[in-house]
């Protein structure tokens, strides 16, 4: 009986020792952290606004939308696909997009509207502001990007 009790105690000690040893080994070498997922595309996410006034800082924002162009066009912009296509065609050059088309006839009234774009375009930080003299000029120069 004494041998049986001793054998059980020895077996228990060996099992307990192996469990503690395995626990010590597991805690000594932590599991490797999962690799951060890298995007295949440079981010393109913008907030676009239209406001009445001559400067964005003092203009009353009338409308604002979000525009995401990667990996697919989305956001609250009513024509996200068209706006993203126009930005890609202009290589993200907002000055090209807001250029008033030649041959446009508008009055010379001063009723300024300002458009802004802020965010990231193809991985590059963007902060753009353009003031149109009046709604006629804005309609002639805003393109799809600021049409909302």
From Swiss-Prot:
One of its GO terms (cellular component) is extracellular region. It is found in: Secreted. Disulfide bonds join 69-84, 106-136. PROSITE patterns: SSI (PS00999). Its main location: secreted. Gene3D superfamilies: Subtilisin inhibitor-like. One of its GO terms (molecular function) is serine-type endopeptidase inhibitor activity. Keywords: Disulfide bond, Protease inhibitor, Secreted, Serine protease inhibitor, Signal. The record marks 108-109 as: Reactive bond. Residues 1-38 form the signal peptide. The keyword NADP does not apply. Pfam families: SSI (PF00720). Coiled coil: none annotated. Belongs to the protease inhibitor I16 (SSI) family. HAMAP family: SSI. Homodimer. Inhibits transglutaminase-activating metalloprotease. This is Transglutaminase-activating metalloprotease inhibitor. It comes from Streptomyces mobaraensis (Streptoverticillium mobaraense).
């Amino acid at each position: 009986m004494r041998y049986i009790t001793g054998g059980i105690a020895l077996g228990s000690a060996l099992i307990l020792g192996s469990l503690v040893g395995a626990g010590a080994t597991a805690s000594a070498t932590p599991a490797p952290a999962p690799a951060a997922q890298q995007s295949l595309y440079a981010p393109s996410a913008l907030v676009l606004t239209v406001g009445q006034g001559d400067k964005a800082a003092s203009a009353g924002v009338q409308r604002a939308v979000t525009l995401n162009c990667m990996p697919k066009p989305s956001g609250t912009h009513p024509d996200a696909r068209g706006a993203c296509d126009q930005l890609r065609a202009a290589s993200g050059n907002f000055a090209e997009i807001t250029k008033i088309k030649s041959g446009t006839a508008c009055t010379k009234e001063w009723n300024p509207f300002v458009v802004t774009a802020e965010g990231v375009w193809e991985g590059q930080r963007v902060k753009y502001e353009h003031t149109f003299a009046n709604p006629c000029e804005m309609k002639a120069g805003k393109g799809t990007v600021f049409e909302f």
